Amino acid sequence: MSKNKLSKGQERRVQANHQRRLKRTDNKPELDDSQLGEPQDGIVISRFGMHADVEAADGTQHRCNIRRTLRSLVTGDRVVWRPGVGTHAGVKGIVEAVHERTSVLNRPDIYDGVKPIAANIDQIVIVSAILPELSLNMIDRYLVACETLEVEPLIVLNKIDLLDAEARKTVDGMMDIYRHIGYRVLEVSSQTREGMEAFEQALADRISIFAGQSGVGKSSLLNALLPPSDKQILVNQVSDVSGLGQHTTTAARLYHFQHGGDVIDSPGVREFGLWHLEPEQVTQAYVEFRDYLGGCKFRDCRHDTDPGCAIRGAMEKGDIAKERFENYHRILESMASVKVRKNFTDAAG
């Protein structure tokens, strides 16, 4: 007797259930109270399934089991853990509780919803570069994410050494768009170290996460900032001619900068999906729009070609950058497109 073919959505759910059963039957070592020391505070350096690397107050790192009652644990979480008496199959302790987060960075996934990928972030470093391409649209997307998450952004333009004087002047003008609306912008080079001292100062005493497209030099910057003992973030071979790199990071991990501050390097922030946001949230995330909200002729103004739009009027007078205004509508269009695909996928499942 023939069986009906499973839809893609059903196949995903079957596979997910199978993986959950595998985890439940995993014979990982368990530590009871007699094998555990006193509770102490620590920070999650990295997460691996039902294990986490936890850094203790003295700087030592310990591979720990995670209590099954802890549903969400990510890099950057401040936790209560108990060291084991000895080592059991490579496990040195157990994470028992998670302190309240000051912030959480979520990654929207078209299939699995919104997932946390890092916690207690103080700032998001938006790394862009003049090669492979300086994309103001991508910077604006990251800024929307930062404003929505209420995490302070820092815009860093890398590979500035590849510009001649005329091109440098043009790029400075583009970056002034962001300086004029209150964002911090640094222009740096990991090769010549131009701007790196100011960058180090901006990173001190904070937990940062680097965001940016592949090839903008995130890993090169991190390696320039990390102490020699921690240079585990590798960059694929880079052409001296093109100056282009490739994304190589594979797992979220917290590192300590040699001049102070920490970074969580995660593959989950190559791009921020914004499809889970409402259009009103994107509008609010444009800081220069806020003074004009409520000033439009119509309450349901889309801030496009609507008559009496205060935001478009401000753009036409030069009070709002045309580039930012156009990217605002590109973001809304891309969000609508992804939502259509997601709704189609959900219906197919």
From Swiss-Prot:
Cofactor note: Binds 1 zinc ion per subunit.
Metal-binding recorded as keyword: yes
Disordered, as annotated region: 1-38
UniProt-recorded Gene Ontology molecular function terms: GTP binding; GTPase activity; metal ion binding; rRNA binding
Enzyme Commission code: 3.6.1.-
PROSITE patterns in the cross-refs: ENGC_GTPASE (PS50936), G_CP (PS51721)
A Gene Ontology cellular-component term: cytoplasm
Coarse class of the protein's main subcellular location: cytoplasm
InterPro entries on file: G_CP_dom, NA-bd_OB-fold, P-loop_NTPase, Ribosome_biogen_GTPase_RsgA, RsgA_GTPase_dom
Location within or outside the cell: Cytoplasm
Binding annotation for GTP: N158, K159, I160, D161, G212, Q213, S214, G215, V216, G217, K218, S219, S220
Top-rank taxon, per record: Bacteria
Matches recorded under CDD domains: YjeQ_EngC (cd01854)
Cofactor(s) needed by this chain: Zn(2+)
Disulfide partners: none
UniProt keyword annotations, A-Z: Cytoplasm, GTP-binding, Hydrolase, Metal-binding, Nucleotide-binding, Ribosome biogenesis, RNA-binding, rRNA-binding, Zinc
Domain CP-type G: 102-272
GO biological process: ribosomal small subunit biogenesis
Keyword tRNA-binding: no
Positions of Zn(2+) binding: C296, C301, H303, C309
Job description of the protein: One of several proteins that assist in the late maturation steps of the functional core of the 30S ribosomal subunit. Helps release RbfA from mature subunits. May play a role in the assembly of ribosomal proteins into the subunit. Circularly permuted GTPase that catalyzes slow GTP hydrolysis, GTPase activity is stimulated by the 30S ribosomal subunit.
Family statement drawn from the similarity comment of this UniProt entry: Belongs to the TRAFAC class YlqF/YawG GTPase family. RsgA subfamily.
Subunit annotation: Monomer. Associates with 30S ribosomal subunit, binds 16S rRNA.
PANTHER family the record matches: SMALL RIBOSOMAL SUBUNIT BIOGENESIS GTPASE RSGA, SMALL RIBOSOMAL SUBUNIT BIOGENESIS GTPASE RSGA 1, MITOCHONDRIAL-RELATED
Protein name: Small ribosomal subunit biogenesis GTPase RsgA
Species annotation: Serratia proteamaculans (strain 568)
